[in-house]
Amino acid sequence: MSHTSSKKRIFSGIQPTGNIHLGNYLGAVRHWVDSQEQYENIFCVVNSHAITIRQDPQELQNKTYELAGILLACGIDTKKSHLFIQSQIDEHAALAWILDCNIPMGDMSRMTQFKDKSNKNPKNINVGLFNYPALMAADILLYQADFVPVGEDQKQHLELTRDVAMRFNRDYGECFNIPEPMIPQVGARVMGLDNPQSKMSKSAQGENHAIFLLDSPDVITRKCKKAVTDSQSNIVFDESRAGLYNLLCIYEIFTQKSRKSIEAEFEGKGYGHLKMALAEVIIESLRPIQQSYAKISQDKTYIQSVLTKSADSIRPIAKNTYENAKRLVGLV
């Protein structure tokens, strides 16, 4: 089932837990902003997913509005795109139940993220965490998305989404568009500064692990200085030297310079020089975002009104999809 817009539709979701960091920005948000002319974008703050792990209620509310404000500051333009909060639209949870009843236990049991997250939080293994992929599928399918930007860690969930959509269409009748993955090549995997073997994460514990979009210049400089490298001295793009490679890739993305010119720039120079140059580039690149957020965050009612208006404009699509699915399975 397709939609009537001439532009292809993209659904993107981001959780309001933790703080948004450089990996989120370079791997996802920056591409979202750049794609607004080419695609019809639906950006969703997926706060219902966040409560699969126990949250402080007030903190969750605050982080939800903070994330929305940061996305606006990064350049999400609600005249061109939709930006709303998942829990504003009841059809997400309602469709997830219908999908739950049409996903075999075996398929859900194979989801590696459930195993990873339950191992990290053994005292908080709940049904919501297990059913997380069904809600994610509902998020996507509600809006008849053509594409979903996904990292490597979410590809399995999108495959499940595609499988359940195709199975539903076959068993009940045409209802869902089958979404395709959109995997950005550049900046898709920004690694942790303190552990370049693992992806930069909002939930990592180390204070020097990630650079957050609202970090001050002093904090950014400190984190860059403490970034893990190696004992060699030449500065070249070499994937086997994970720490150095990560820093160079971040520098490459922000400066838009070629790898050859970057290697020439740092020829004969030490890691300290690279780290300071990287810190300066990050600080200057984040400055307009931080300045914009400082203005936006002063007016919470503005953020709320933007989110409400966007939710109201997108709700008919969700309602139409849900009502169709509901009718097809025989619910009244």
Curated annotation (Swiss-Prot):
Give the residue ranges of motif 'KMSKS' region. 199-203
Q: Can you provide one Gene Ontology molecular function annotated for this UniProt record?
A: ATP binding
Where does the record locate the signal sequence feature? none
Annotated ATP binding lies at Q15, P16, T17, G23, N24, G151, E152, D153, V190, K199, M200, S201, K202, S203
Q: What reaction(s) does this enzyme catalyze? A: tRNA(Trp) + L-tryptophan + ATP = L-tryptophyl-tRNA(Trp) + AMP + diphosphate + H(+)
InterPro entries for this protein: aa-tRNA-synth_I_CS, aa-tRNA-synth_Ic, Rossmann-like_a/b/a_fold, Trp-tRNA-ligase, Trp-tRNA-ligase_bac-type, Trp-tRNA_synthetase
BP terms from Gene Ontology: tryptophanyl-tRNA aminoacylation
What single Pfam family name could you report for this chain, choosing any that match?
A: tRNA-synt_1b
Where does it reside?
Cytoplasm
Highest rank taxon of the organism: Bacteria
Residue ranges annotated as motif 'HIGH' region: 16-24
Q: State the protein's purpose.
A: Catalyzes the attachment of tryptophan to tRNA(Trp).
- Entries under NCBIfam families matching the protein: trpS
For this protein, the record's HAMAP family field holds: Trp_tRNA_synth_B
- Tell me the protein family, please: Belongs to the class-I aminoacyl-tRNA synthetase family.
Q: How does it assemble?
A: Homodimer.
Q: Identify this protein by name.
A: Tryptophan--tRNA ligase
Supply the source organism for this entry. Answer: Helicobacter hepaticus (strain ATCC 51449 / 3B1)
Lineage, broadest ranks:
Bacteria, Pseudomonadati, Campylobacterota, Epsilonproteobacteria, Campylobacterales
